[in-house]
Amino acid sequence: MKSHSKKPIKALIEIPNWLGDCVMFTPAFDNIINYYNDIEITIFGSSASIELIKNHPKVVKTLTIDSKNKFSYKAFAHLGSFDVFFSFRGSIRAKIIKFIISATNKYQYSHAKYPRGHQVEKYVDFVNDCLNTNSAPGSLSCYLTNAKSKGASRILGINPGASYGSAKRWYPEQFAKIAIELSDNFDIMIFGGADELEFAKEIEGHLIKNNISNYLNLAGKTSISELTNYISNLDIFITGDSGPMHIAASLDIPTIALFGPTNPIETSQWKNPHSVIIKKDLECQPCMKRTCPLKHHNCMKLIEAREVIDSISEVSQK
């Protein structure tokens, strides 16, 4: 729908806080933009999510809200008036913000209303319900500029972290086994956030003990833009269910995704033709817990390095 007013539609959008959720939100975001066409968007959310979205040409203003910044509801009272407000979060804080801000139309996502399907589809269904449309979910979008610097060597990326909780994490020694075996054919990039340094360091320690030097430990050293650029240059990416996994999906990077407590029906890579999922079919899966409630962590512990290595040929042929 094109705006027939002289001024563009002013929209305020609360984007998902988690990096992976924010990547999965991009098809819904694109559908909003396609519906209004002439639109100016103010977004707010976590610093990681803001960095992912802020370069879109329709975004005119950003407001970062996370643990690093002192939160104040007053900031929203002074944002001015909007034609439409979308919140892609179902939190109590989001409900309060919805009440405070001035907007002609206000919409808030509810997890309970969209219990089934992939998260991409849930976000798109929410937008369809808000706008009375029937738009299909498109591909993931990456709004960051990637200056690919692909060299002659093939690159294997390994991502041992998962910010959601320890239940989603595979084991550093298993990642190390893969890196050691494949180091003759690949340069190694180790990824991770600031809270995952010890896992990356443990992998690095195994590589050093085996006299492997063709690796780069990037854990805690990249912005979201830099992370995206590094991922764009990978030949193979091995990762748990995480934000970087979804960034890789947006770039169609061949990926082996390791799933334990979470549900690949909901959060697998969206429309990545070069993706392989490895998971164990246990009665306790998916528990959706941050830590293993049964204390054995078999959903991840039973995944072996050999089956991941054997999957590389499969994902390479896709």
Predicted features and spans:
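Catalytic machinery of carbohydrate-active enzymes
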Residues: 1-318
